[in-house]
Amino acid sequence: MKKKTLKRIDLLLLVIVILLTTVLVYRISNKEKLSDAYLASDTSNVFVYDEDDKEVSLVRGQLVSLSDKTKEMNGNEYHKVYLGGTVYYVYKDNIVLDRESSVLEKSLYVYRTCSVYEDKEGSKLAGLIERGEKINVVGHGPLKDDGSVDRYQFDGGYILSKYLTNDKELLNISNPFSNDTSNPYGAGSASELDYIGNEKVQVEGNVMPDVCKSLYINREAMEDIEDYIELAKRTAVNTFVIDIRDAHIVSYKSDIMKERSISSYDAAAFTMEEFKAQLDKVKDAGIYMVGRITVFKDKNFMIDHPEFAIADLNDDGKPFMYGGSYWPSPFVREVWEYNVELAKEAVIKLGFNEIEFDYVRFPEQIDYYADKLNALDLQNKYNETRSQAIQRFLMYAVDELHSVGAYVSADVFGETSNNYVTAYGQYWPAISSVVDVISPMPYPDHFNTHAYNIEEVVWEVPYKLLLAWGKEAKKMQDITPNRARVRTFIQGYNSISRPYVVYDNEKLLDQINGLADAGILDNGYIVWNAGSYIDNYCLYEDALSR
């Protein structure tokens, strides 16, 4: 009896052991195995499902814990993943094993003609690519936390993602000026320019005043900057437009100049440290700082790099001299790079809020010398129109300067209030759609004596003149998509044409009121006095206080 009982116990124990072993083997064999993986997609977001089978959007490039468990959904296999303690189910093609591979775009379309970069980072250019072209993606720039990338690589270099799309339908967006084929001065038709425009940004930590009441400050004035700061404190002035480079007049010894234009570096009045010390006083006073750079009029740079100049074919191909200066060609990308790097340095090292590009144009009468006389080599490598070169430079400059937290403004002639492309390549809508601020220069003494059929000499009646001019400028601004703000130059000096007129406080106020009544004052004004004479500016204290 005892032996039978023991046998039963042994048998029972054996059964228990077998059952426990079976359970253990089952558990071991069914234990969830986890490994690192990344969410991947051909857009910045990945669509996945949660445990309730609801569709959820997650940012691509995120690290997840990939389970060896799968789930059948809609006839497809989905992998179980863990992200932040939450379970999701991801389609197998949206899982990769390294973060760089999480960008799945294979081909994209160029929907705005744009610059091509040499590298995944930096401002060095490799060429140009036209709207409508299809690229095969072979790489990309750094993947950002929001799942986007700034640049895509193809066999010709890198393109900013903002100029690319996977939606071919976007190529059918019509040009609002497509019926305009006028080309009166040979600088290109309005219909050949880009009006998709840059979305206007609010740079974090860099607040542009709603109305900029501005004084122009040249290199010499920086020596006594305290006087101008005191004037600003007594008035409503809140912005200084400060020279970085004015043609051959250079303010400070820039490291970029030392590297790329030693003649410019040697011509500088201040060291960078000295100049920054003066700028710090401006910043400490709460004044918005705009750095002015003359772009395509630069004698010193042409001395160092004649190969980038507009060439005079009547003078053995030497740099073309016009208006007392040599002119870098707006078609040459090395010129673009130099000026943009100079601007970025000014923002990063000196703290400018905004860069204002002046002389962002070809020389006056370029149509006569280049088109009629065939006397110039403009070095037009990409067969662009003059207006395309100007607009595309500004597109490049805006992209680069926005990346370092600065705004961009461009100076244009008062002539741009007319609805045609000027000979020197400026067309109001093409520029206003790209930059943050457009700054026209309708100086009264630069107009024809009886412009707009005004009976009086127009610089004797600046209110009437700028009211008439402003109404025309507003028409151009109103037809511009994605338009910039308008900050207009006004005349802060006595007229240089007969009859000579003293421009006193009343005349300054007349200009401001004319612009305001025309509805074009918008982002304020800049008082232009080439000498930046403090005595002249003090004469306007009443007008500047309003």
Please tell me what each predicted stretch does:
Residues 435-449, 459-546:
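Substrate-binding cleft of secreted/luminal carbohydrate-active enzymes
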Residues 235-270, 364-373, 537:
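Aromatic-lined carbohydrate-binding/catalytic grooves of carbohydrate-active enzymes
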Residues 48-60, 118-131:
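SH3/SH3-like (including bacterial SH3b) beta-barrel domains
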Residues 225-250, 349-354, 437, 515-525:
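Catalytic domains of carbohydrate-active enzymes, especially glycoside hydrolases
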Residues 82-109, 150-203:
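Boundary regions of SH3-family modules and the immediately adjacent low-complexity/disordered segments
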Residues 59-92, 130-163:
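SH3/SH3-like beta-barrel superfamily modules
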